[in-house]
A protein has these predicted regions:
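C-terminal membrane-cytosol helix-exit motif in multi-pass small-molecule transporters
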Residues: 151, 155-157, 175-196
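Helix-to-loop junctions at the C-terminal end of transmembrane segments
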Residues: 60-73, 159, 262-276
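Cytoplasmic helix-loop-helix junction between adjacent transmembrane helices
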Residues: 104-142
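C-terminal ends and interior cores of transmembrane alpha-helices
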Residues: 82-97, 286-298
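Pair of pore-lining "gating" transmembrane helices in MFS-fold secondary transporters
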Residues: 4-37, 108, 210-230, 308
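Juxtamembrane intracellular "pre-TM" segments in multi-pass secondary transporters
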Residues: 1-8, 189-219
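Hydrophobic core of transmembrane alpha-helices in multi-pass small-molecule transporters
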Residues: 19, 100-115, 302-317
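C-terminal transmembrane helical hairpin of 12-TM major facilitator-type secondary transporters
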Residues: 271-320
Length: 322
């Protein structure tokens, strides 16, 4: 019988790391489009900085896995957090210098960092028994609830931290949070099998890819994550365009991320009782149910804006985009 003491310790460490490292995503999402609109040479490129975060996650996921396989979880996560520090500093420099290119480079690097953060929940299962794995994932995901508050509140409280350089302090704070993450992940303990028990190399990647379950999981991830990103990327910029404050836009992202991680208190036990396939299907049904209502509301809002303008940049009065 597997002793879950190390797994429980690592789960607590990873939940704290999720709270700190996970704050990077709502920070960039809250401000990326707004800053992009101010710095970009073309209005159509306004949301590129946020899109580059998602690209960084996609590009960094497999390399992060290879790094951790070679260096171990603790060293790999320290390296990932260093990317987070670099991303925050480069983004801050881009904002301070008014450089759209530098800001985009910073958000891309932040995406590489988030690729490591997103694997925290899976690392929690390394030394866990079969019965504890689902709950370990849920506990780490609960750290995302704290991240949902830390990220947007960092935006609100640090956006004017550097006099005369709006939002520069926010990305410096993002770098500081990544530094704190390094301190936290340093407390990770190696899983028992790492002490000397030989391990097989696992199945070849092509064998895994050709499994029907893999295709279903990828399809579900593409649909759910794609629609979530579609909403999050443009929402803060749209709110500011409709007359809301930057703080309100950050709070909008806060509630969105709380909605993402709030069910973590229940999903572990739901998966144990009903199975991961049924829980995934229920999530997709919720997305499908929410979609038509959101499309109708946004279409009315954008149509009203088009009717009020002749192609120029017009900022509607507060509440007119509803």
């Amino acid at each position: 019988m597997i002793d879950d003491r190390i797994a429980r310790h690592n789960t607590r460490v990873l939940a704290a790391a999720q709270a700190l490292g996970g704050a990077a995503s709502p920070i960039v999402t809250s401000l990326g489009g707004i800053i992009g609109l101010a710095l970009s040479p073309d209005r159509g490129l306004a949301t590129l900085p946020v899109s580059l975060v998602q690209l960084g996650v996609a590009l960094g996921t497999l390399p992060a896995a290879f790094v951790m396989r070679r260096l171990g979880r603790r060293n790999g996560y320290i390296l990932g957090a260093l990317l987070g520090v670099a991303g925050g500093l480069v983004a801050a420099a881009g904002v301070a210098r008014g450089s759209f290119l530098a800001f985009c480079l910073g958000t891309l690097t932040t995406g590489l960092y988030i690729a490591y953060v997103q694997s925290y929940r899976f690392a929690a299962t390394d030394a866990a028994s079969v019965g504890f794995r689902a709950r370990a994932i849920s506990w780490v995901m609960c750290g995302g609830l704290a991240a949902a508050i830390i990220g947007p509140q960092t935006v609100i409280w640090t956006r004017e931290l550097v006099p005369g350089l709006m939002f520069t302090g926010t990305f410096l704070a993002q770098a500081a949070l990544a530094l704190l993450t390094i301190v936290v992940v340093a407390f990770l303990r190696p899983a028992p099998f790492a002490a000397g028990a030989p391990r097989s190399g696992g199945r070849p990647l092509l064998v895994i890819v050709w499994q029907p379950g893999f295709a279903i999981a990828v399809a579900a991830g593409i649909v759910s994550f794609g629609l979530m990103s579609f909403l999050m990327t443009a929402a803060p910029d749209a709110m500011v365009e409709c007359g809301h404050s930057v703080g309100s836009a950050a709070l909008g992202i806060q509630w969105h991320v709380l909605g993402m991680f709030g069910p973590s208190f229940l999903t572990g036990r739901l998966i144990e009782r009903y199975g991961k396939e049924r829980v995934t299907a229920a999530g997709l049904v919720l997305i499908a149910a929410a979609g038509p209502r959101r499309v109708r509301r946004e279409w009315r809002g954008f149509k009203e804006r088009d009717d009020r303008s002749s192609g120029g940049r017009v900022r509607p009065a507060p509440g007119k985009c509803r």
